């Protein structure tokens, strides 16, 4: 009742108590995603040898293929690399990328993203804006380390 009188809402609680259990539950994907130069973005026509370098240097175990307009075209994971190992170096990124990857938006609650990662048994996923442009990558380890449950 006092919180309502003072117009103190969940966003205010998160701002003043970000390290607490409730604060972790109120956090958004945008609070944990890696963005900017950290994004593992590759062109669909990129040779897999170059994709491997990008995936290794970025360290997320995932790479996103993008179209010329910058929209997400697909995602390549470590599992995709293992499944295509025999012919990997003769392929291009777009031939391996999953064209229907699991994605989230920056405004999704981090706890919901964690549940999705757990349900799908994946360690990372791409964060896209409302138009489908990659704006971040989210790793399960970052959420667990922060106490999101």
Label the model's feature ranges.
Residues 13-37, 72-123, 130-149:
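Tandem CBS (Bateman) regulatory domains
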Residues 8-11, 65-68, 128:
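Flexible, glycine/charged-enriched surface loops at secondary-structure junctions
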Residues 6, 22-25, 44-48, 110:
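Generic structural signal for well-ordered, non-membrane alpha-helical segments
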Residues 31-71:
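Oxyanion-binding "anion nests"
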Residues 1-7:
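Short alpha-helices
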């Amino acid at each position: 009742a006092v919180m309502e009188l003072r117009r103190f809402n969940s966003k205010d609680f998160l701002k003043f108590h970000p390290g607490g259990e409730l604060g972790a539950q109120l956090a958004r994907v945008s609070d944990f995603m890696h963005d900017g130069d950290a994004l593992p973005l590759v062109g669909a026509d990129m040779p897999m040898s170059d994709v491997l370098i990008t995936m290794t240097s970025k360290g997320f175990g995932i790479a996103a293929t993008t179209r010329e307009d910058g929209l997400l075209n697909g995602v390549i994971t470590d599992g995709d690399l293992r499944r295509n190992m025999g012919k990997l170096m003769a392929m291009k990124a777009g031939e391996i990328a999953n064209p229907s990857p699991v994605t989230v938006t920056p405004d999704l609650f981090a706890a919901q993203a964690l549940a999705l990662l757990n349900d799908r048994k994946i360690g990372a996923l791409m964060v896209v804006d409302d138009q489908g442009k990659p704006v971040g990558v989210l790793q399960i380890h970052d959420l667990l380390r922060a106490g999101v449950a």
